[in-house]
């Protein structure tokens, strides 16, 4: 095991929106180290969001950030063994893990959509999540329901 927690490496902001969160999302989106392809997919998706959006005041990145906020879970259940039985214990999630989970869910459920390109799938999932719809938001709701159902075990904190 490590002696201390690994230091966080600084992320460079992306070239188009100058935002570190976008770079973090693209790093999750990337396959086989193909970062330029991942950036192209993300930027194409943002162009599609820009074309399809209803709210004219907000930029496509603001809509994406709203979608990410709507997908972020606040509590999760973790397994803990107590006297031979395994309990699902609800716990608060730290802020950086909330963001990571939201990004991963959004990408996962985008990939599962039935559309032509990944950019179209991602754009559709972003627009759906911004309206509090879509599979990624459903995943957050299910996670919260699971935590609510197991509230009785919350005294078994880690």
Swiss-Prot record:
Chain segments annotated as coiled-coil in the UniProt record: none
GO molecular function, one term: rRNA binding
GO cellular component: small ribosomal subunit
InterPro entries registered for this protein in UniProt: Ribosomal_uS7, Ribosomal_uS7_bac/org-type, Ribosomal_uS7_CS, Ribosomal_uS7_dom, Ribosomal_uS7_dom_sf
GO biological process, one term: translation
Keywords: Ribonucleoprotein, Ribosomal protein, RNA-binding, rRNA-binding, tRNA-binding
Domain of life: Bacteria
Keyword Cell wall biogenesis/degradation: no
Assembly and interaction partners: Part of the 30S ribosomal subunit. Contacts proteins S9 and S11.
Family designation: Belongs to the universal ribosomal protein uS7 family.
Role this protein plays: One of the primary rRNA binding proteins, it binds directly to 16S rRNA where it nucleates assembly of the head domain of the 30S subunit. Is located at the subunit interface close to the decoding center, probably blocks exit of the E-site tRNA.
Protein name: Small ribosomal subunit protein uS7
Species this chain originates from: Flavobacterium psychrophilum (strain ATCC 49511 / DSM 21280 / CIP 103535 / JIP02/86)
Gene field: rpsG
């Amino acid at each position: 095991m490590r002696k201390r927690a690994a230091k966080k490496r600084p992320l460079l902001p992306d070239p188009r929106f100058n935002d570190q969160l976008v770079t973090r999302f693209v790093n999750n989106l990337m396959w086989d180290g193909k970062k330029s392809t991942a950036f192209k997919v993300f930027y194409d998706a943002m162009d599609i969001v820009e074309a399809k959006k209803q709210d004219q005041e907000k930029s496509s990145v603001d809509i994406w950030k709203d979608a990410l906020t709507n997908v972020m879970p606040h509590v999760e259940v973790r397994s803990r063994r107590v006297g031979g039985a395994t309990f699902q214990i609800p716990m608060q999630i730290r802020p950086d893990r909330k963001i990571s989970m939201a990004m991963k869910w959004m990408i996962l459920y985008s990939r599962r959509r039935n559309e032509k390109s990944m950019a179209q799938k991602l754009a559709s999932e972003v627009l759906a999540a911004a309206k509090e719809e879509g599979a990624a938001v459903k995943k957050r709701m299910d996670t919260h329901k699971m935590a609510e159902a197991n509230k009785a075990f919350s005294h078994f904190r880690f």
